[in-house]
Regions:
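Extended, charge-rich alpha-helical interface modules
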Residues: 1-124
Length: 124
């Protein structure tokens, strides 16, 4: 069951990579709401040759990485200190989007997709 939950949350990572690939126009916003899984499936299903797509510029992706690193840090600090997670953040969405950006930009510790971004963030 835990593996199924983890798989389901990976759609947030997929949404982030869809953003990197410029398959959506809207910005990658504050991680407070979950993505639309049906939309992700439709986008991937209806896009020919994903490997040929041009990604967003490095500076845009690195700017998002830094922003999501800060969101992730805020969530982890709140949990470690027994405080409430900031109300504008969802811990799981934050974790998965940070994971995807870290993996895509080849950050140390994120060399493999299946690596874990667990730093005190709840998995359920």
């Amino acid at each position: 069951e835990q593996e199924n939950i983890r798989f389901a949350w990976r759609f947030e990572s997929a949404w982030t990579l869809i953003w990197v690939l410029r398959l959506v126009r809207e910005p990658l916003t504050t991680p407070r709401n979950t993505c639309d899984v049906d939309r992700i499936i439709a986008i991937v299903r209806d896009t020919d040759n994903l490997a040929a797509l041009a990604c967003r510029p490095d500076n845009a992706t690195l700017d998002k990485l830094e922003l999501f690193r800060r969101y992730h840090w805020a969530v982890c600090q709140a949990l470690e200190n027994g405080q409430n997670i900031p109300s504008h953040l969802d811990a799981n969405v934050t974790r998965e989007r940070f994971h995807a950006l870290s993996w895509y930009t080849r950050q140390p510790g994120f060399e493999t997709w299946d690596g874990d971004t667990e730093t005190s963030v709840a998995r359920n």
